From Swiss-Prot:
Protein name listed in UniProt: Bifunctional UDP-glucose 4-epimerase and UDP-xylose 4-epimerase 3
Lineage of producing organism: Eukaryota, Viridiplantae, Streptophyta, Embryophyta, Tracheophyta
Broadest EC class assigned to this enzyme: isomerase
Cofactor(s) the protein requires to work: NAD(+)
Family: Belongs to the NAD(P)-dependent epimerase/dehydratase family.
Pfam families linked: GDP_Man_Dehyd
Organism from which the protein derives: Arabidopsis thaliana
Role noted for this protein: Catalyzes the interconversion between UDP-glucose and UDP-galactose and the interconversion between UDP-arabinose and UDP-xylose. Cooperates with UGE2 in pollen development. May preferentially act in the UDP-galactose to UDP-glucose direction, therefore displaying a role in carbohydrate catabolism.
Activity modulation notes: Strongly inhibited by UDP.
One GO BP: UDP-L-arabinose biosynthetic process
Annotated metabolic or biological route of this protein: Carbohydrate metabolism; galactose metabolism; Nucleotide-sugar biosynthesis; UDP-L-arabinose biosynthesis; UDP-L-arabinose from UDP-alpha-D-xylose: step 1/1; Cell wall biogenesis; cell wall polysaccharide biosynthesis
Temperature-dependence annotation: Optimum temperature is 35 degrees Celsius.
Domain of life of the organism encoding this protein: Eukaryota
């Protein structure tokens, strides 16, 4: 526990999938946590389950606020009432397809919300942030694994918001060097807390692979659409770097500790992935093994803007954050199925 004992962390989007898992780890490590979330793509039940997982004592260190970063007053209210040592900024919309159809919604949520957050942090002299970036900033990389100093490019409005927010972070740090900002580029987060009490519960039809497979397995959807079966990969399906959400959560704690301990961190990006590529069909097969369920698939044409293979180089995070993913694909599928099996309708009762 050490120096983190009463450090107070603001977690935006803390009721979401990665947010809840990270909050559990932060509380277990002795941090105080305040969540702000507008529950646009999450539910307050997830926060109740976090309290249940950490127990009554640690729960006293967790505060939840319903609020929206697009409304500066909501952020101001938090900062005027208490001092924050750092911010972990998860809040934002994250569906690639939706961003193409409704880019203004993405610019409003992801850009305006973050700019308001920076303004308020500056006003109250809280100048440390861990930011949720994404492997989408690599676009369709010419070579893999993706290394942090690759040239960045975005393929869709969602990716552009992440890329632009990275640039904003670099600009703020260049102008005001006392800021310390770590940009975490997530690859493909999957799995769930081993208890099966929290996990990913997207509203509507999921746009990423695991919740989709999961909804087929529990009978909510008839089959899995596999987009692209003619890629130049081992089985024709696209290859991605899937990472267990608990590994990702630990990566945030490692990043936070780095902010507190390294005065020279500046504004730095780290990949959070396993460094291993897994194809969509391999993932389906691994999930079938974990769940004992057959997943019917339908082979569909490629989606525009989807890359063939994207996986991380993880050396920089290993070396500088002392962090390395522990879980493999089998454990990811095991924990995903445990969550799905116990909560076939997510945090809701069956509708």
């Amino acid at each position: 526990m050490g120096s983190s004992v009463e450090q107070n962390i603001l977690v935006t989007g803390g009721a979401g999938f990665i947010g809840t898992h990270t909050v559990v780890q932060l509380l277990n490590q002795g941090f105080k946590v305040t969540i702000i979330d507008n529950l646009d793509n999450s539910v307050v039940e997830a926060v109740h389950r976090v309290r249940e997982l950490v127990g009554p004592d640690l729960s006293t260190k967790l505060e939840f606020n319903l609020g929206d970063l697009r409304n500066k007053g909501d952020i101001e209210k938090l900062f005027s009432n208490q001092r924050f040592d750092a911010v972990i900024h998860f809040a934002g919309l994250k569906a690639v397809g939706e961003s193409v159809g409704n880019p203004r919604r993405y610019f409003d949520n992801n850009l305006v919300g973050t700019i308001n957050l920076y303004e308020t942090m500056a006003k109250y002299n809280c100048k440390m942030m861990v930011f949720s970036s994404s492997a989408t900033v690599y676009g369709q990389p010419e070579i893999v694994p993706c290394v942090e100093d690759f040239e960045l490019q975005a393929m869709n409005p969602y990716g552009r918001t992440k890329l632009f927010l990275e640039e904003i972070a670099r600009d703020i740090h260049a102008a005001e060097p006392e800021w310390k900002i770590i940009l975490l580029r997530y690859f493909n987060p999957v799995g769930a807390h081993e208890s099966g009490r929290i996990g990913e519960d997207p509203k509507g039809i999921p746009n990423n692979l695991m919740p989709y497979i999961q909804q087929v397995a529990v009978g909510r959807l008839p089959e899995l659409n596999v987009f692209g079966h003619d890629y130049p990969t081992m089985d024709g399906s696209a290859v991605r770097d899937y990472i267990h959400v608990m590994d990702l959560a630990d990566g945030h704690v490692a990043a936070l500790n780095k902010l507190f301990s390294d005065s020279k961190i500046g504004c730095t990006a780290y990949n959070l992935g396993t460094g291993q590529g897994t194809s969509v069909l391999e993932m389906v097969s691994s999930f079938e093994k974990a769940s004992g369920k057959k997943i019917p698939i339908k082979l569909c044409p490629r989606r525009a803007g989807d890359a063939t293979a994207v996986y991380a180089s993880t050396q920089k995070a290993e070396k500088e954050l002392g962090w390395k993913a522990k879980y493999g694909v089998d454990e990811m599928c095991r924990d995903q199925w445990n969550w799905a099996n116990k909560n076939p309708w997510g945090f809701q009762k069956k509708p």
